[in-house]
């Protein structure tokens, strides 16, 4: 699951490694750009039809079905609701930029209802490719 798909930049990288990517983008402008990128054949993905409230309230989507969740863009808080609703053994990767984590890529691994947090690296656009190459990342 990719949250905040934007133009589809990271989606296009991930689509090289997975045949099935579900994406969430709630900005109407970005949704149209994302759809245009799919139509141009830049990547293959499924854009889920959700509002931001439906997503965060876990109404139309069951986060538990995903084992790998990537959140694009910087968060100023840890994604507590997503972690809480994720299934055991789910991995959640995001960038957090606040006073505790200055623009860090953070990975959460949920085990037996608890979440383990790992600070991976400084956030940079080339990092996702390095991460996908070095980690067993199956969607």
Predicted regions and their residues:
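Conserved nucleotide-cofactor-binding alpha/beta core module
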Residues: 1-111
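Active-site capping/gating segments
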Residues: 97-139
